[in-house]
């Protein structure tokens, strides 16, 4: 179950939300959890500099039916971003985020982006930022089928992107992106040698360099599609190995089809991953969403995840036959009211 209330007034916006889930397994056990949170942000224009600043807070709680103590966690962040026009063709973004997660501490994450117009409907950009990802509460405190790791730390590191984007026509958009990342304490899934159960651990180092290419096309007022591909070389060092080892996947393909007619819209998205480690089979994940505008203020949306109900391994296979699977086909019905 999910509920959200959002308020917007000119340059200020705020929201409160709640989410409740019940994960059932192929045994007699299941996992329950809920999240509640809020965020607020505002925009200002001081001279020629645009400033966006805000804060957010979230409380997470989870418990399973096998006697594990319930786990709960608070997290929050404050952030700002400035936007400055430098000359007629250059725009600079400069910002930072101070993020805090209980059990993981806090990290200061700066960001710098430069956007340069190099021609009609064509630009290049440079983006450098530091990121932080705290472990999911279930990754740290376990589930009915997974060991807990209270010492699991948040991962953090630097990300670098150099991109090019060109609007070929009013209906065609082409993007090229080259990226590199260096992550400390990267969170990954492994198998415990004693119990045979899965457990999440921290890798000492993680690095990944790759390229992404995407194309978007509007066929008509009703139909559109997008295509994308990626090639990367993700590697990590663990506590048990001082050598760089392959991880995750090398090749990725994605595609989407969109339809829009009057008050109705529909989209199907597909992601395919191959070139994986340990003989893990390719993964195909297809999601769909449908939307209907009931009135000018009311919208009904249906989202279906894992449309084909595949049980492909999503992440963390140490043998090629085990790991975190795609969730079973599930759906979310959303009603939105503007007032």
PLM segments and residue spans:
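Conserved C-terminal beta-signal and adjacent last beta-strands/turns
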Residues: 82, 126, 246-339
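Gram-negative outer-membrane beta-barrel transporters
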Residues: 85-92, 179-182, 201-277, 296, ...
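Face-selective signature of the C-terminal outer-membrane beta-barrel domain
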Residues: 1-117, 172-178, 218, 224-228
């Amino acid at each position: 179950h999910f509920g959200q209330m959002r308020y917007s007034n000119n340059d200020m916006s705020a929201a409160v939300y709640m989410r409740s889930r019940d994960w059932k397994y192929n045994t007699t056990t299941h996992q329950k959890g809920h999240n509640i949170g809020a965020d607020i942000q505002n925009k200002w224009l001081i001279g020629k500099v645009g400033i966006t600043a805000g804060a957010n807070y979230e409380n997470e709680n989870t418990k399973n039916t096998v006697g594990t103590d319930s786990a709960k966690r608070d997290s929050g962040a404050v952030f700002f971003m400035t936007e400055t026009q430098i000359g007629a063709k250059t725009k600079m973004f400069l910002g930072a985020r101070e993020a805090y997660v209980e059990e993981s501490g806090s990290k200061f994450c700066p960001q710098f982006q430069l956007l340069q117009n190099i021609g009609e409907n064509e630009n290049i950009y440079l983006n450098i930022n530091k990121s932080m990802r705290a472990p999911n509460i279930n990754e740290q405190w376990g589930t009915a089928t997974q060991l807990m790791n209270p010492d699991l730390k948040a991962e953090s590191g630097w990300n670098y992107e150099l991109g090019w984007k060109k609007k070929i026509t009013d209906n065609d958009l082409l993007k090229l992106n080259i990226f590199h990342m260096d992550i400390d304490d990267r969170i990954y899934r492994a198998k415990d040698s004693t119990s045979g159960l899965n457990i999440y651990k921290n890798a000492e180092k993680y690095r990944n360099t790759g390229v992404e290419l995407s194309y978007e096309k509007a066929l008509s007022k009703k139909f559109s599609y997008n295509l994308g591909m990626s090639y990367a070389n993700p590697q990590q060092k663990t506590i048990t190995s001082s050598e760089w080892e392959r991880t995750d996947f090398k090749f990725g393909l994605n595609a989407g089809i969109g339809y829009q007619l009057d008050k109705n819209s529909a989209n199907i998205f597909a992601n395919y991953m191959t070139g994986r480690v340990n003989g893990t089979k390719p993964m195909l994940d297809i999601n769909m969403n449908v939307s209907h505008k009931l009135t000018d203020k009311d919208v009904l949306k249906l989202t279906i995840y894992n449309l084909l109900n595949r049980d492909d391994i999503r992440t963390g296979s140490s043998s090629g036959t085990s790991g975190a699977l795609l969730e079973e086909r599930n759906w979310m019905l959303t009603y939105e009211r503007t007032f």
